[in-house]
Amino acid sequence: SGPGLSRNYGANCAGGEYLLFLDSDCIVPPEYIAVIKQACRTKKIDAFGGPDRAHHSFTSIQKAINYSMTSFFTTGGIRGQKKTMEKFHPRSFNMGCSKKVFEFTEGFRGLRFGEDIDMSIRIMEAGFDTCLLPEAYVYHKRRTSFRKFFKQVYNSGMARINLFRLHPQSLKLVHFLPSVFVIGCLICLAASCFLSPYYLLAIGLLALLFFTDSLRLNKNVKVAFLSVIASFIQLTAYGIGFIHAVFLYGILHRK
């Protein structure tokens, strides 16, 4: 039935005032529920979400992927960071809403990818508020290989154009940046071959930025090195998926 419709089934069976949605690859800290309860007692909350982190037991590749998926430099802060280039949209790996909001929006659509962002957009379009609960974090297990990670992020790039077709106003500048990265890297590589090798400095400086930032956060040289690879994979895969979807739906007008 897909992730969205499966969540709908569970939500329709639930009897509480609030609904929580978590991915099956997430680990919930002991204080997670208490943090959410306290937030709901403090103020009226329609829908909310929290960030994701890497557990100390995760592999080096998973920690590196966690860096690339959460860093401001690779995502613009849209995945639960306080500093962000886009309004916060709760995502279903760590998301909650009142039963009233769920029933009003009729839950998740049967989309293969991006169904959680679609629901968050519809929640806000209906006039409800969403908020980030920074302390309501989960430990999110990442893909175990870079190959699987590439496929995941490529699908996310494709999904962003599908979301644009449903919600034209949802496409922001930050969503174009991975495509700009892909085109920029190709230009630098071509220029280094035909003009001057110094054009590779731009790519090298970006790699150095990812390395030093990950080293600062993870305190591990191996994770920092893998974070550079993960970050380049993420930006490339998302950018290619985004460009591919633009070509399919914008130029070829596929349905």
Role assignments for model-derived ranges:
Residues 23-27:
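The conserved acidic donor/metal-binding loop of glycosyltransferases
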Residues 1-14, 35, 85, 89-93:
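Glycine-rich, basic loop-to-helix element that forms the pyrophosphate-binding segment
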Residues 109-171:
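Catalytic donor/gating beta->alpha subdomain of glycosyltransferases that bind UDP-sugars
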Residues 54, 77-100, 112, 118, ...:
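A recurrent flexible, glycine/aromatic-enriched loop bordering the glycosyltransferase active site
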Residues 19:
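Short aromatic/hydrophobic "clamp" motif used to bind/position activated sugar donors
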Residues 181-252:
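Membrane-embedded multi-pass helical conduit in multi-pass membrane proteins
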Residues 30-63, 136-137, 141:
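Conserved donor NDP-sugar-binding/catalytic core segment of glycosyltransferases
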Residues 3, 7, 32, 93-94, ...:
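Conserved donor sugar-nucleotide recognition element shared by glycan-biosynthetic enzymes
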